[in-house]
């Protein structure tokens, strides 16, 4: 056996190990009851925002009105917290963290939890949005997907996309946008779980945070978080509409990461 064959033989178990870890990650993140519950809750919040628009004949109006004219949007952070944000608290409560730390370092354990929560937060919000898009023809059978019936609900930076009827890009933009916010809401709930040992507080804190930031934004001359979640401002281009939320939610997610690592390492030393 030559040197190249030996290298291939040695690399095969490593590749299988990586594939196994990826499969476990996908299974524990997406194929769970909590992920399905979070996606259904997200879809339900969209539907609640459209309760007064049952007679609408425009698909685009139904989709836009579900967030633009709805007060239920403050419940969206709970959806991102459903799949994985409580895992850290449950591991501590059941003393599973002690068993996990026998096989890996504290830093790796906390990083894995944080990444899984961020990915699941993005995915559950995106899945809920896509599920709502699929339910619109069922809940609103008279709604027609046409630019001619947009009724002033389209933001200027997406006007050309809607005129070309590139609906994949149009709805994909909003799905990506709500997914970005889902990353932050998920890791925020995870960070709270490292400091607070109460399930209700973990779920309620992101809602209160969103409401408080929206209340303070006009006084601080800033864009509100809910406005950035759904691009409710008149940006010049779609790149700006995507960049502002990315910077805002990304920077706050970094702060959550630092707070979670600090408290998580301290909790692991005390356990």
Model-derived features with residue positions:
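Hydrophobic core positions of alpha-helical segments in small-molecule transporters
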Residues: 41, 111-112, 124, 205-206, ...
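Secretory targeting signals
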Residues: 47-86, 114-194, 230-248
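Short, Lys/Arg-enriched, Gly/Pro-containing loop segments at transmembrane-helix junctions
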Residues: 97, 144-146, 266-271
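Helix-loop-helix units of permease transmembrane domains in multi-pass membrane transporters
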Residues: 86-120
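Alpha-helical membrane-protein architecture signal
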Residues: 15, 19-26, 107, 111, ...
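Hydrophobic alpha-helical transmembrane segments of integral membrane proteins
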Residues: 116-130, 200-234
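Hydrophobic alpha-helical transmembrane segments
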Residues: 1-91, 194-195, 211-271
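Membrane-helix interface segments
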Residues: 105-107, 198-203
């Amino acid at each position: 056996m030559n040197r190249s064959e030996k290298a291939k033989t040695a690399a095969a178990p490593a590749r299988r190990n990586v594939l196994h870890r990826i499969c476990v990650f996908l299974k524990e993140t997406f194929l769970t009851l909590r992920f399905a519950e979070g996606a259904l809750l997200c879809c339900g919040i969209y539907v609640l925002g459209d309760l007064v628009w049952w007679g609408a004949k425009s698909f685009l109006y139904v989709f836009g009105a579900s967030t633009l004219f709805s007060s239920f949007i403050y419940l969206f952070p709970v959806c991102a917290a459903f799949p994985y944000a409580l895992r850290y608290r449950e591991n501590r409560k059941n003393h599973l963290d002690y068993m996990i730390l026998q096989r890996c370092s504290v830093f790796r354990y906390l990083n894995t939890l944080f990444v899984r929560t961020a990915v699941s937060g993005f995915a559950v919000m995106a899945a809920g949005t896509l599920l709502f898009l699929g339910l619109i023809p069922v809940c609103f059978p008279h709604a027609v997907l046409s630019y001619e019936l947009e009724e002033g609900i389209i933001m200027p930076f997406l006007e050309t996309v809607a005129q070309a009827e590139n609906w994949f890009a149009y709805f994909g933009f909003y799905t990506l946008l709500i997914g970005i916010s889902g990353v932050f809401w998920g890791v925020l709930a995870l960070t709270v779980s490292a400091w607070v040992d109460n399930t209700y507080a973990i779920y309620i804190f992101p809602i209160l945070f969103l409401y408080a930031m929206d209340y303070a934004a006009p006084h601080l001359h800033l864009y509100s978080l809910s406005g950035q979640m759904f691009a409710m401002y008149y940006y010049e281009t779609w790149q700006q509409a995507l960049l502002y939320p990315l910077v805002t939610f990304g920077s706050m997610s970094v702060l959550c990461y630092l707070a979670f690592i600090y408290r998580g390492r301290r909790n692991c030393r005390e356990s």
